[in-house]
Amino acid sequence: MDVSVCIVNLNAKQHLASCLNLLPESLGSCSYEVIIVDNHSQDGSQEFIQQEYPGFHLLINHRNEGYTQAINSAIRVSRGDYLAVLNPDSEPGPNSIFTLIEFLKMNENIGIVGPKVIASDGSFQRSCRRGVARPAAVFSYFLGLAKRYPNDQRFTGYHLNHLDENEINEVSGVSGSCMVIRRKTLKDIGYFDEQFFAYQEDSDYCLRAKERGWKVYYNPHSIVKHRGGMGGANSVPMKAIFEWHRSYYKYYFKHFADDYSMIFNIFYSIAMVGKLIFAEGKYLIKQ
């Protein structure tokens, strides 16, 4: 088995067919299996998958334990030499996953690779390639400095805006909306860290891979369209906002807190709580 395509679904029925129907063309000549974990959807997703895609392996969670727990469930039963982690609101382009797998086959020291990800309108999703999310890079992103000064590397350390989006580059992380992982890398570093309910589990996983000596690459010769925020995030927006901020907090304290003073760690905590309150307040006002 060449590749196991692993998808976590939560109330994304309206987008599933677009994703699943494009898989054969995206995989080229690869032999593959598709494993879908449904995270307690309430929109008829489970019945839809069972009726329309009986050849796919469906795992059903009876409550939402979080994205990371669900993707690990899929990985544990997978058999492929490569793992393609894919969001249900993603639309993989022709030979997109095949291209990433061939890239890994030609580069034995690369453990993880991600494609160029575009939005529905064709615009580039900068979050598909990442630097290390240290405080300076994260705050530049939060404050909009990276977007305002896209060519200034003092501010673009997180989404690497200064790099050409059409060039292959080594990066520190790629997006879990679509990433391909070598089985040997999985055996070396283990599963995704389930302390992350959702969000930043992909950045954490890539950083762990790099710490073990694996390289992580962005390859724009593979293109995947990602609607973003559909399904799970849209189902419970306040929960999504909370988990997004909590994951950044956990990521920082897992990897970087020991590099900074206690005073700075307190400041970081206060800043994240403040941003969470602002984000949730902004959402409620819009309602």
Where are these regions (language model features)?
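Short, acidic, metal-binding catalytic loop of nucleotide-sugar glycosyltransferases
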Residues: 21-31
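A conserved acidic beta->alpha catalytic loop
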Residues: 22, 38-47, 63
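Glycine-rich, basic loop-to-helix element that forms the pyrophosphate-binding segment
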Residues: 61-78, 99
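Short aromatic/hydrophobic "clamp" motif used to bind/position activated sugar donors
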Residues: 83
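Conserved donor NDP-sugar-binding/catalytic core segment of glycosyltransferases
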Residues: 91-127
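Short, flexible, basic/aromatic active-site loop/helix in glycosyltransferases
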Residues: 132-172
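A short, conserved alpha-helix in the catalytic core of glycosyltransferases
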Residues: 163-223
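Active-site-adjacent helix/loop segment of glycosyltransferases
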Residues: 207-286
